[in-house]
């Protein structure tokens, strides 16, 4: 907007406390494990090693799979829809060929 000025960045605090070396080493070790392996069981083990952190949520089980009969019904329904769309497209192509005889 024309009447507004951009905000300045926050000033850098030179007295900011640095992490003690043992905490930095532990964070580095945890980060290496997380980024190298990246699978759910390993992550839960790594998170369990972090002091003072509790696990917020458990891993959910995957959604239940469909019954094969439902899949067959859905497949048949999709085929019927595809057949109708295919028939409509063929009719449109035929009509466009009949009315657009300019070659």
From Swiss-Prot:
Function field = Promotes activation of caspases and apoptosis. Promotes mitochondrial membrane changes and efflux of apoptogenic proteins from the mitochondria. Contributes to p53/TP53-dependent apoptosis after radiation exposure. Promotes proteasomal degradation of MCL1. Competes with BIM/BCL2L11 for binding to MCL1 and can displace BIM/BCL2L11 from its binding site on MCL1. Competes with BAK1 for binding to MCL1 and can displace BAK1 from its binding site on MCL1.
Location, primary (coarse class): mitochondrion
A GO BP entry: negative regulation of mitochondrial membrane potential
Protein's UniProt keywords contain Mitochondrion:
yes
UniProt-recorded name of the protein: Phorbol-12-myristate-13-acetate-induced protein 1
Query: What domain of life does the UniProt record list for this protein's source?
Result: Eukaryota
The protein's gene is named Pmaip1
Q: Show the domain comment.
A: The BH3 motif is essential for pro-apoptotic activity.
């Amino acid at each position: 907007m024309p009447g507004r000025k951009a905000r300045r960045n926050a000033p850098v605090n030179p007295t900011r406390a640095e992490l003690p070396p043992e905490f930095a080493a532990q964070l580095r070790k945890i980060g290496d494990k997380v980024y190298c392996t990246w699978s759910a069981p390993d992550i839960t083990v790594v998170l369990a090693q972090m002091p003072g952190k509790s696990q917020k949520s458990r891993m959910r089980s995957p959604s239940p799979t469909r019954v094969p009969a439902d899949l067959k019904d859905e497949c048949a329904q999709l085929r019927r829809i595809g057949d109708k769309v295919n028939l409509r497209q063929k009719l449109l192509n035929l009509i466009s060929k009949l009315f657009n005889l300019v070659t």
